[in-house]
Amino acid sequence: MNRNKLLNGNGGHIWVDGELLGNVKSVDFKLTGNFADIACCGDPATYAAYEGYAGEGTLETYKVNSELVTKIVEGFSTCVIPDTKIITKVENPVSGRAERWALTGVVFTEAAVAKFEAQKTIEESLPIKFTHAENLEKIKG
Protein backbone atom coordinates (compact mmCIF):
# COMPACT_ATOMS: atom_id res chain seq x y z
CA MET A 1 0.00 0.00 0.00
CA ASN A 2 1.25 3.44 -0.89
CA ARG A 3 0.59 5.61 2.18
CA ASN A 4 0.90 8.74 0.02
CA LYS A 5 -2.39 7.79 -1.65
CA LEU A 6 -4.34 7.76 1.63
CA LEU A 7 -6.92 10.47 2.15
CA ASN A 8 -7.63 12.18 5.45
CA GLY A 9 -9.95 14.88 6.69
CA ASN A 10 -7.25 17.55 6.63
CA GLY A 11 -7.82 17.74 2.88
CA GLY A 12 -11.58 18.21 3.27
CA HIS A 13 -13.56 21.30 2.26
CA ILE A 14 -17.28 22.15 2.37
CA TRP A 15 -19.15 24.86 0.48
CA VAL A 16 -22.73 25.74 1.47
CA ASP A 17 -24.46 27.76 -1.24
CA GLY A 18 -21.07 28.66 -2.72
CA GLU A 19 -19.53 29.84 0.56
CA LEU A 20 -16.48 27.93 1.79
CA LEU A 21 -16.85 27.01 5.45
CA GLY A 22 -13.56 27.26 7.32
CA ASN A 23 -14.94 25.98 10.61
CA VAL A 24 -15.87 22.40 9.69
CA LYS A 25 -15.06 19.72 12.25
CA SER A 26 -16.53 16.75 10.39
CA VAL A 27 -19.10 15.67 7.84
CA ASP A 28 -21.04 12.46 7.45
CA PHE A 29 -23.38 12.47 4.43
CA LYS A 30 -24.80 9.24 3.03
CA LEU A 31 -27.45 7.70 0.80
CA THR A 32 -29.47 4.82 2.23
CA GLY A 33 -31.37 2.51 -0.06
CA ASN A 34 -34.96 1.68 0.86
CA PHE A 35 -35.70 -2.00 0.28
CA ALA A 36 -38.83 -4.06 0.87
CA ASP A 37 -38.49 -7.70 1.88
CA ILE A 38 -40.20 -9.95 -0.66
CA ALA A 39 -41.00 -13.56 0.23
CA CYS A 40 -42.53 -15.88 -2.34
CA CYS A 41 -44.38 -19.12 -1.68
CA GLY A 42 -42.28 -22.16 -2.51
CA ASP A 43 -39.00 -20.23 -2.17
CA PRO A 44 -37.27 -20.03 1.23
CA ALA A 45 -35.26 -16.97 0.22
CA THR A 46 -36.14 -13.40 1.09
CA TYR A 47 -35.51 -10.95 -1.73
CA ALA A 48 -34.83 -7.24 -1.47
CA ALA A 49 -36.91 -5.05 -3.77
CA TYR A 50 -35.46 -1.58 -4.24
CA GLU A 51 -38.01 1.18 -3.62
CA GLY A 52 -35.87 4.32 -3.60
CA TYR A 53 -33.33 6.06 -1.42
CA ALA A 54 -32.95 8.75 1.20
CA GLY A 55 -30.04 11.14 1.65
CA GLU A 56 -29.13 12.33 5.10
CA GLY A 57 -26.21 13.28 7.28
CA THR A 58 -24.67 15.71 9.70
CA LEU A 59 -22.40 18.71 9.34
CA GLU A 60 -20.35 19.32 12.50
CA THR A 61 -18.82 22.79 12.86
CA TYR A 62 -17.09 25.00 15.37
CA LYS A 63 -19.26 28.05 16.03
CA VAL A 64 -17.68 31.20 14.60
CA ASN A 65 -20.83 33.09 13.56
CA SER A 66 -24.62 32.82 13.52
CA GLU A 67 -25.26 33.02 9.78
CA LEU A 68 -26.16 29.42 8.96
CA VAL A 69 -28.20 28.81 12.11
CA THR A 70 -30.07 32.09 11.56
CA LYS A 71 -30.86 31.05 7.98
CA ILE A 72 -32.24 27.71 9.22
CA VAL A 73 -34.32 29.30 12.01
CA GLU A 74 -35.72 31.94 9.63
CA GLY A 75 -36.77 29.16 7.26
CA PHE A 76 -38.55 27.32 10.06
CA SER A 77 -40.21 30.53 11.30
CA THR A 78 -41.44 31.71 7.89
CA CYS A 79 -42.24 28.25 6.48
CA VAL A 80 -39.99 29.15 3.52
CA ILE A 81 -37.21 26.58 3.62
CA PRO A 82 -34.14 27.78 1.70
CA ASP A 83 -33.02 25.82 -1.37
CA THR A 84 -29.54 24.80 -0.28
CA LYS A 85 -26.67 23.15 -2.16
CA ILE A 86 -23.60 21.61 -0.54
CA ILE A 87 -20.34 20.78 -2.32
CA THR A 88 -17.82 18.51 -0.62
CA LYS A 89 -14.21 18.03 -1.61
CA VAL A 90 -11.53 15.84 -0.11
CA GLU A 91 -8.11 15.97 -1.73
CA ASN A 92 -4.75 14.35 -1.36
CA PRO A 93 -2.16 17.14 -1.16
CA VAL A 94 0.64 14.80 -2.27
CA SER A 95 -1.03 13.55 -5.46
CA GLY A 96 -3.26 16.58 -6.05
CA ARG A 97 -6.16 14.22 -6.76
CA ALA A 98 -9.59 14.97 -5.31
CA GLU A 99 -13.09 13.60 -4.86
CA ARG A 100 -15.99 16.07 -5.05
CA TRP A 101 -19.71 15.63 -4.48
CA ALA A 102 -22.66 17.98 -4.99
CA LEU A 103 -25.67 17.53 -2.72
CA THR A 104 -28.89 19.21 -3.86
CA GLY A 105 -32.33 19.47 -2.37
CA VAL A 106 -30.61 20.00 0.98
CA VAL A 107 -32.70 20.90 4.01
CA PHE A 108 -31.31 21.43 7.48
CA THR A 109 -33.63 19.63 9.89
CA GLU A 110 -32.42 21.04 13.20
CA ALA A 111 -30.64 24.10 14.58
CA ALA A 112 -29.53 24.70 18.16
CA VAL A 113 -30.31 28.31 18.99
CA ALA A 114 -28.29 28.25 22.22
CA LYS A 115 -25.79 25.63 23.33
CA PHE A 116 -22.64 26.36 25.31
CA GLU A 117 -20.64 25.17 28.29
CA ALA A 118 -18.00 26.81 30.48
CA GLN A 119 -14.42 26.38 29.24
CA LYS A 120 -15.51 24.53 26.09
CA THR A 121 -15.28 25.52 22.45
CA ILE A 122 -18.80 25.73 21.05
CA GLU A 123 -19.61 23.12 18.43
CA GLU A 124 -22.70 22.91 16.23
CA SER A 125 -24.30 19.76 14.90
CA LEU A 126 -26.45 20.44 11.84
CA PRO A 127 -28.41 17.41 10.57
CA ILE A 128 -29.51 17.47 6.94
CA LYS A 129 -31.64 15.60 4.45
CA PHE A 130 -30.99 15.83 0.71
CA THR A 131 -32.55 14.52 -2.47
CA HIS A 132 -29.65 14.09 -4.90
CA ALA A 133 -25.91 13.39 -4.76
CA GLU A 134 -23.81 13.90 -7.88
CA ASN A 135 -20.17 12.91 -8.19
CA LEU A 136 -18.30 15.87 -9.68
CA GLU A 137 -14.80 14.43 -9.49
CA LYS A 138 -13.53 10.98 -8.60
CA ILE A 139 -10.15 9.55 -7.73
CA LYS A 140 -9.16 6.67 -9.96
CA GLY A 141 -6.87 3.82 -8.86
Name each model feature, range by range.
Residues 137-141:
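Short acidic DE-rich linear segments
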